[in-house]
């Protein structure tokens, strides 16, 4: 891994050029940070915003059950870091996860002294896992998922990944398909279980309906509104072409565009204007003007508010080969959902929603425009789709208590403090 140091530094610098947040707190990524002087702690790792949002109920419940143990939360991305600090502030100890370098990991462990490592979804770092095994720190992979694309991506490193996965005390998989893939990866059968997807347990924040009602009134209460959320560079042109088609049917329609990554914000605003759309943005205008045709959300942490405002919700990362993003947020808000053809990151969930007439799968931007028009034109159909989506969410709830039961079983068997 040390031979890869030039590549690591280059990637960090490259990302910093796109997102200035990567230029901050470099030392944390090498295990250098203020020693909190913990005797023991509970450590939860979530790579970025989506994984952290899923981890919130687990973190809250762990803090409630173990008030005597400090809570450590790590992320990799600056946006994930911002979300942690906004949600918990000083109630948790937050740093970036160090690079997968033995010395950096040793410094990290020496400072936080974790009693357990709760790793969200698909974060498998060989040196980190080997160090956990060496220090007798149980690894719990929560909300575990593994796509076919991820399996293929391990390639020549497969044997190393297999050895790392075997270090896990328990893999709590989202689905039977995910469980089978972890078994194929080499996880021990008695250390893999299916608990469901924690994201089904999302709680709708208080006051969300009131905020949406106020904003819709300010935008023009009767105008149709749709949202294109978590979009990527390769699909935003298709989304804007869809909106042009929608405006042909609904001249007063408003599209809310929410780029997935902050470094895309300014480019997305420019792209909307290049199509000739009257465009406003959240950071400058706060709310969409009555004559706005596009409203770009160039802030973080507000996606649920804008989902609640929409009459139809397109979830991005699915028109391009990204694999899709979280469709359960609009589903939990009783919204009709549209997705593209590439949803392999959430294959089982999206197939269920489509199969139960809660979501519509489209092939391209032209079809997206056509289907959004149909949803906006038929209030009864939109309501039925939203209710079907919510029914799927309600039926699948319960992963958080099942996950907590498994974590508590491991904690009760683990030593009071790990060996450092």
What are these regions (language model features)?
Residues 1-420:
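Nucleotide-activated sugar donor-binding and catalytic core shared by glycosyltransferases
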């Amino acid at each position: 891994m040390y031979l890869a140091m030039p590549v690591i530094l280059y990637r960090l610098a490259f990302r910093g050029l796109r997102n200035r947040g990567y230029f901050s707190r470099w030392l944390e990524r090498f295990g250098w940070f203020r020693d909190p002087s913990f005797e023991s702690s509970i450590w939860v790792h979530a790579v970025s915003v989506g994984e952290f949002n899923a981890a919130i109920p687990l973190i809250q419940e762990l803090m409630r059950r173990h008030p005597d143990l400090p809570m450590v939360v790590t992320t990799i991305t600056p946006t994930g870091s911002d979300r942690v600090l906004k949600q918990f502030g000083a109630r948790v100890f937050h740093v970036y996860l160090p690079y997968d370098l033995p010395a950096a990991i040793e410094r990290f462990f020496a400072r936080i002294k974790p009693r357990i490592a709760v790793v969200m979804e698909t974060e498998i770092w060989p040196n980190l896992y080997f160090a956990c095994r060496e220090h007798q720190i149980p690894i719990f992979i929560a909300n575990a998922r593994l796509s076919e694309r991820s399996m293929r991506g391990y390639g020549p490193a497969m044997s190393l990944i297999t050895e790392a996965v075997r270090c896990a005390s328990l893999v709590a998989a989202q689905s039977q398909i995910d469980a089978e893939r972890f078994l194929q990866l080499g996880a021990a059968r008695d250390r893999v279980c299916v608990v469901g997807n924690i994201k089904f347990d999302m709680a709708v924040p208080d006051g969300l309906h009131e905020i949406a009602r106020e904003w819709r009134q300010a935008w023009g209460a009767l105008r149709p509104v749709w949202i294109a959320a978590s979009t990527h560079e390769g699909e935003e042109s298709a989304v804007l072409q869809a909106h042009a088609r929608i405006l042909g049917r609904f001249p007063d329609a408003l599209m809310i565009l929410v780029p997935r990554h902050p470094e895309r914000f300014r480019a997305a605003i420019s792209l909307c204007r290049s199509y000739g759309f009257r465009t406003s943005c959240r950071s400058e205008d706060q709310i969409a003007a009555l004559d706005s045709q596009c409203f770009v959300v160039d802030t973080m942490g507000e996606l649920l508010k804008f989902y609640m405002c929409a009459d139809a919700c397109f979830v991005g990362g699915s028109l391009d080969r990204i694999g899709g993003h979280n469709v359960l947020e609009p589903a939990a808000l009783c919204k009709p959902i549209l997705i593209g053809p590439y949803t392999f990151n959430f294959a089982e969930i999206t197939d269920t929603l489509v199969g139960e007439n809660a979501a519509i799968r489209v092939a391209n931007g032209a079809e997206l425009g056509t289907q959004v028009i149909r949803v906006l034109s038929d209030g009864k159909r939109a309501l039925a789709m939203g209710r079907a989506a919510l029914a799927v969410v309600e039926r699948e709830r319960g992963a958080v208590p099942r996950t907590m039961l498994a974590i508590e079983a491991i904690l009760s068997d683990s030593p009071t403090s790990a060996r450092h």
